[in-house]
């Protein structure tokens, strides 16, 4: 595939779904995010997303903005999304990446979300 997150970001795309969050550090906080877990969803349901498939191939659907990883993670934690995907992503992160999420949360007055029992082992 060869694309990196910054390449997609320059194109104005948001990457979504478990693989994109883990591999690229970018994702969407839109309500349609759960659709990005599936390879066979019709394109009209994905309007505005970049779908990264499990096999590494991708489909770009235009018209989205990008979010840096700390913002994407905080946004995900606020929405009703698959907690296991978030935990899986946090498990893959370095201490510096976890710290960047903490810093972003403090700067944006979102520290309260980090105190949630679901994330306590990471931000405790």
What feature does the model see in each segment?
Residues 1-68, 75, 79-80, 84-108:
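Short gly/ser-rich loop at a beta-strand->alpha-helix junction or flexible surface loop bordering the NTP-binding
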Residues 100-124:
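Structured mid-to-C-terminal alpha-helical surface segments
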